[in-house]
Amino acid sequence: NAENKDEFKSMSVVMCRFGGDEGAEVLALLTTREVYIVEGKRRQLVYLPTSPVPMSGGLVFVAEDAISPVPGMDADDLMKIYFSLGALMPEDGEGGLPRAARSNIADASD
């Protein structure tokens, strides 16, 4: 229904960091700006899509300081990335995403 679609589009795209500075970063949707206290710690509720069916993801409480906004990217852009298994990434540096590394893996193995 249209109301659910509007709620989905109002979610903010964020990058969630798991495992500290050397860990992994995952594109996700911040479902609400509300902060929840879980076991005495500040958490926010994010939706972690999965690929290639983003709607089969899950809701996770993530530490507030492990969430960074991704300016210039909306929920539709995020879903395109997940549906395409990453093939439809924004141009380098667009949408707040890091630039792609310019290396040829095949050359590196020679």
Please describe what each predicted stretch is:
Residues 6-110:
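Terminal membrane-proximal soluble interaction domains of membrane-associated proteins
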